[in-house]
């Protein structure tokens, strides 16, 4: 925090709060009345009070939007009258005593405060929910909007909107809440209701809640209002039974799935931690609005209701169920980690959230509700891979520890403190640590943490305190070193694997460095390259895990046996570069045997995709290794096992990148076709009739990629004409949607006359596409409108693949006439693949090259388009600005390899006309040049293999 911490500055800290709040949601005044009796004790961390024997005259508490009316303090029978002043900038109430206050070990300083606070009225999702807030909603019986729900949100610094306190996570106290409110309302808080007492008015009552365990102010909470509820009892360890309730303002029957999930997983978590659930009850309160979506208040979890009020028809969707369960169990984990054990700074929020997600996913997977999560696409491809790519793209990237050092103040919201990058890296770190340590060992280590209540519950701690404790318990320094390495070292490593035969023996050498994409020589020299603690997860050629070498802690490691793959199942946060022929030969052997995991093969291709085209990292072995695997899969003697279609599609994505880079060389293009594309095309069993509706979607993706890569082939064109006829004429469900784009591209590429082209051009009209949607096999259940749109976009993208000069002119005229329509620039897509080819007329080659025709068209229209595109604030201007940038990007790519001066001259002339930055042509050109450097790198090593 940027503000001075009261937990360090103040002579006293709270040990107990007794609160009475008077809340009437119906009243027009947006205020509540509050009184607090706060027990204060000597602060051993105080910078202003050396010891308990010293006296003081001033102390402070946080208070935001509170008007303190009066205050006094007592120690035993001694009373201290207090003067109150406000520091509104720092949100402090300052209490001054005329006589010195001398603390005693026997008697606390008891502060009594009367005050008034605000209740915020929340009407939309854009309104921020913090402190106490209320929402009115329609009574479904009367049809009037006079029902109310009042709730709280205290994280990170909004408890001080409810009562004067030290609103910092380092301070843990107990709480006893009393609420005076309308008798018609349900009232829920952290602890059970202990007593309900009628007040003078028969319509009001006082609800007294039991005293809480030690907890931070951020997880204090309550809710009152017109709430429906579901309730059950859950049996826990030791024949203990606790009530669990779900509250919501409406549709409470739709909360049954939430209740069932809590009933299943609360006992499982208690068993996992070997620590009793810390409270005598648990409630979920589902609210119409909640800015942070969910809040793990101790014993009273609040969640925005649309996440957990799930109607039966929605529960049929597996993804909906899994997301709801992840959310519920995540919040349940917090009852132990985050609430019972809490952290002394918001700098640890990443760990608190990462831990809850990691353990929730582990427990759900272990108990059959999140099948194969840690090897699933949502985890590996939607979380791990994008995070690694971002990390490798930033030479100035920060470690988790550095990210967490945020300059937060008392006005900060959770969104200001939470960092998704640190959170995701934290989950990955915990998962890899779990595997490296052993699931049962890590669980026992965590059990030992919860056993030590004096250290881990009586006070707030740091995450590293937990790992130091577990390391000592397991007698392993590697635990602490591992966590320290992954939290304090920025970026991610790449591990190079070299296998060689020496004196009749196999020797494997591993070398690690930090991995950064497109690193210049100067940046490489300045890069901090500290070795990571890398969990190897190695697999031996016999398929067993390598148990001899499990952790790479130094720069290099050598051992005298071969390794098949490391980072098995992609569970580690690093890239692997296989840099020996022997590595790829071994991989191919296991593909033949079908013993190589499909996830491992996909990971090999994913990592190669990061190396290929990277001037500072790519070498010829990466291209050779890719070709060796793809050629092996394409060979007639190798069967493509169904499990390999998915990784093969990733390998072909890398090949498409190489294919795009080789467009300037017919020799390189011929090499790729002959070595991989044609053998793969010949190997695939292409249906000449209807497709099997149960065909693997990944197989269909591979088919689509192979058709596109083989688009110049007459044999491919003949096949696609059959599919194109089925697309236009049927029968029903005869062409997979996944193949439509590639079919259209191949047909367009081989169009010989206007009549043929018009069949494709007709599909540019949405109405024509709508009429053929029933001819398409739709694997992903898009509706007919979505399917028609996809066919239409595919048709537009395919127009530019035709080489007939008359058709090219018609395509360009079509773009010109419709330039103000969304997506028309897509029609240029094909020209970018044929830009070096000669146009033909009546199937006879002409002198003019495609890109020369495109350039004449571009130059003839640019100034007119640019004038319109630079009219800011108009719909046409904004759209044309975007379209013209896209068109310029495509055309610049056609000349960057061999005529860059042409583009540079054009940009300089246009800047004189239009101004320096109206279209940012310099930025577009810089991006194109950067991409070309990557393509040059590919061509450099590709040429050496041809």
From Swiss-Prot:
Q: What is its EC number?
A: 3.4.11.-
**Modification N-acetylserine occurs at:** 2
Q: How is the cofactor bound?
A: Binds 1 zinc ion per subunit.
Marked site (Transition state stabilizer) residue numbers: 423
Gene Ontology cellular-component terms listed: cytoplasm; extracellular space; membrane; nascent polypeptide-associated complex
- Please tell me where this protein is predominantly located: cytoplasm
Q: Which residues form the active site?
A: 331 (proton acceptor)
- Compartments it resides in: Cytoplasm
GO molecular-function annotation terms? Answer: metalloaminopeptidase activity; nascent polypeptide-associated complex binding; peptide binding; zinc ion binding
**Which GO terms are recorded in the biological process aspect for this UniProt protein?**
peptide catabolic process; proteolysis; regulation of cytoplasmic translation; ribosome biogenesis
Q: Does the keyword Protease apply?
A: yes
- List of residues binding substrate: 293-297
Segments passing through the bilayer: none
Entry binding sites for Zn(2+): 330, 334, 353
Keyword terms:
Acetylation, Aminopeptidase, Cytoplasm, Hydrolase, Metal-binding, Metalloprotease, Protease, Ribosome biogenesis, Zinc
Q: Which CDD domains match?
A: M1_APN-Q_like (cd09601)
Q: Is Protease among the key words of this record?
A: yes
Q: How does it assemble?
A: Associates with ribosomal complexes.
Q: Which family does it belong to?
A: Belongs to the peptidase M1 family.
Q: Mention any additional remark.
A: Present with 5110 molecules/cell in log phase SD medium.
**Role this protein plays:** Putative zinc aminopeptidase which may be involved in ribosome biogenesis.
Q: What is this protein called in UniProt?
A: Protein TMA108
Recorded source organism is Saccharomyces cerevisiae (strain ATCC 204508 / S288c) (Baker's yeast)
């Amino acid at each position: 925090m940027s503000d001075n911490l009261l937990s360090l500055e103040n002579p006293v800290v709270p040990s107990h709060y007794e609160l009475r709040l008077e809340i009437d949601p119906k009243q027009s005044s947006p205020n509540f009345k509050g009184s607090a009796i706060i027990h204060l004790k000597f602060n051993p961390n105080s910078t202003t009070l050396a010891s308990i024997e010293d006296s003081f005259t001033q102390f402070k508490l946080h208070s935001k939007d509170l008007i303190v009316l009066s205050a006094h303090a007592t120690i035993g029978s001694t009373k201290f009258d207090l003067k109150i002043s406000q520091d509104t900038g720092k949100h402090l109430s300052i209490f001054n005593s005329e006589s010195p206050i001398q603390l005693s070990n026997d008697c606390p300083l008891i502060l009594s405060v009367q005050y008034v606070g605000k209740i915020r009225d929340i009407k939309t999702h854009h309104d921020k929910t913090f402190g106490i807030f209320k929402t009115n909603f329609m009574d479904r019986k009367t049809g009037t909007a006079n029902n109310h729900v009042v709730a709280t949100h205290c994280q990170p610094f909004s408890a001080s909107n409810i009562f004067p306190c030290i609103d910092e996570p380092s301070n843990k106290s107990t709480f006893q809440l009393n609420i005076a409110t309308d008798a018609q309302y349900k009232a829920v808080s952290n602890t059970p209701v202990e007593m309900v007492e009628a007040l003078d008015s028969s319509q009001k009552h006082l609800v007294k809640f039991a005293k809480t365990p030690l907890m931070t102010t951020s997880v204090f909470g309550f809710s009152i209002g017109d709430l429906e509820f579901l309730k059950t009892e859950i049996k826990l360890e030791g024949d203990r039974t606790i009530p669990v309730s779900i509250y919501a303002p409406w549709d409470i029957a739709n909360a049954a799935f939430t209740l069932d999930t809590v009933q299943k997983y609360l006992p499982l978590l208690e068993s996992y931690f070997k620590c009793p659930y810390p409270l005598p009850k648990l409630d979920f309160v589902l609210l119409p609005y909640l800015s942070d979506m969910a809040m793990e208040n101790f014993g009273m979890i609040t969640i925005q209701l649309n996440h957990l009020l799930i109607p039966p028809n929605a529960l049929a969707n597996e993804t909906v169920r899994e997301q709801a369960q992840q959310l519920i169990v995540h919040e349940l984990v917090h009852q132990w980690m985050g609430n019972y054990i809490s952290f002394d700074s918001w700098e640890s929020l990443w760990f608190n959230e990462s831990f809850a997600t990691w353990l929730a996913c582990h427990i759900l997977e272990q108990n059959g509700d999140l099948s194969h999560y840690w090897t699933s696409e949502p985890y590996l491809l939607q979380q791990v891979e994008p995070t690694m790519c971002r990390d490798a793209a930033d030479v100035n990237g920060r470690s988790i520890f550095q990210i967490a050092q945020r300059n937060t103040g008392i006005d900060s919201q959770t969104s200001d403190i939470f960092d998704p990058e640190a959170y995701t890296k934290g989950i990955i770190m915990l998962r890899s640590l779990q595997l490296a340590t052993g699931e049962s060992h890590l669980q026992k280590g965590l059990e030992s943490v919860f056993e030590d209540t004096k250290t881990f519950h009586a006070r707030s701690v740091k995450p590293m305190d937990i790992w130091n404790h577990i390391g000592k318990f397991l007698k392993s320094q590697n635990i602490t070193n591992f966590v320290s390495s992954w939290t304090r070292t920025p970026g991610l490593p790449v591990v190079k694997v070299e296998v060689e035969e020496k004196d009749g023996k196999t020797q494997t050498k591993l070398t690690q460095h930090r991995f950064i994409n497109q690193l210049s020589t100067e940046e490489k020299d300045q890069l901090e390259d500290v070795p990571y603690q890398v969990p190897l997860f190695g697999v031996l050629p016999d398929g067993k895990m390598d148990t001899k070498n499990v952790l790479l802690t130094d720069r290099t490691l050598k051992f005298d046996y071969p390794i098949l793959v490391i980072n098995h199942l992609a569970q580690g946060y690093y890239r692997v570069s296989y840099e020996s022929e022997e590595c790829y030969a071994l991989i191919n052997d296991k593909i033949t045997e079908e013993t190589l995991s499909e996830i491992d093969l996909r990971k090999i291709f994913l990592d190669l995709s990061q190396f290929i085209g990277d001037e500072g990292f790519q070498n010829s072995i990466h291209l050779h290794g890719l070709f060796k695997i793809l050629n092996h899969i394409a060979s007639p003697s190798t069967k493509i096992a169904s499990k390999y279609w998915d990784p093969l599609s990733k390998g072909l994505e890398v090949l498409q990148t190489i294919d795009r880079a080789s467009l300037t060389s017919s020799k390189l293009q011929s090499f790729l076709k002959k070595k991989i594309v044609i053998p793969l095309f010949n190997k695939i069993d292409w249906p000449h009739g209807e497709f099997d509706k149960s065909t693997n979607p990944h197989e269909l993706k591979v088919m689509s990629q192979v058709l596109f890569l083989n688009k110049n082939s007459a044999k491919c064109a003949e096949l696609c004409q059959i599919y194109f006829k089925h697309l236009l004429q049927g029968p029903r469900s005869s062409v997979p949607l996944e193949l439509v784009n590639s079919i259209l591209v191949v047909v367009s590429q081989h169009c010989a006359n206007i009549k043929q082209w018009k069949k494709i051009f007709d599909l540019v009209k949405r109405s024509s596409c709508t009429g053929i949607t029933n001819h398409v096999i739709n694997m992903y259940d898009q509706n007919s409108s979505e399917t028609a749109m996809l066919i239409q976009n595919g048709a537009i993208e395919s127009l530019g693949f035709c080489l007939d000069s008359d058709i090219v002119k018609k395509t360009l005229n079509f773009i010109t006439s419709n330039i103000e329509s969304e997506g028309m620039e897509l029609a240029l897509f094909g020209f970018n693949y044929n830009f070096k080819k000669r146009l033909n007329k009546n199937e006879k080659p002409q002198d003019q090259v495609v890109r020369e025709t495109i350039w004449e068209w571009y130059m003839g229209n640019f100034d007119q388009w640019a004038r319109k595109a630079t009219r800011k604030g108009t719909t046409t201007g904004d759209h044309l600005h975007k379209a013209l940038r896209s068109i310029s990007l495509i055309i610049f790519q056609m000349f960057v390899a061999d005529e860059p001066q042409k583009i540079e001259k054009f940009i300089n002339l246009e800047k004189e006309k239009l101004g320096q930055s109206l279209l940012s042509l310099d930025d577009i050109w810089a991006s194109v040049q950067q991409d070309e450097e990557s393509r040059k790198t590919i061509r450099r090593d590709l040429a050496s293999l041809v």
